[in-house]
Amino acid sequence: MPIKPNFTAADIRARMNQEIERRKRGLITQLLYIGEECLKQARSGHKYLNQTGNLCSSIGYCVLVDGEIVHEGEWKQTSEGKGGEKDGKTGSSQGVAFLHELAAKQTTQGIVFLMVAGMPYAQYVEAMSLDVLDTSEQMAERKIKAMRNRLFKTK
């Protein structure tokens, strides 16, 4: 008596696609947590003198899937500062613009994590060994690598 399958090749494909989507959602959710941790680190762990609040307000992240933004971190305007305008509005708007500009240039298919400091002088502050995104970048790389190993390890 032969054994007959009670499923089709289409059933197998559908099940595989479900599993892929489940893992994709898990990956995106983990990236959101990582993004929030890195954002918190970047905004609170800096050593530079925050004069206007713009640099701190220009820091943000997003997650893209196939070139489309599926989630963007909250843009908080900080009013910490030692002089001048201290509302962080300029930083926040430049951060959003820079993040969206970079996201539009992404040609990578799949899931992409982007984190930016949108003020034009951020690289100069980094060059003076004052942490803007360095520590957050290292944290993100470490956590994303650990997450990939955890989510996609073979049993």
Predicted segment positions?
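Short, Lys/Arg-rich flexible segments
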Residues: 1-76, 81-83, 87-155
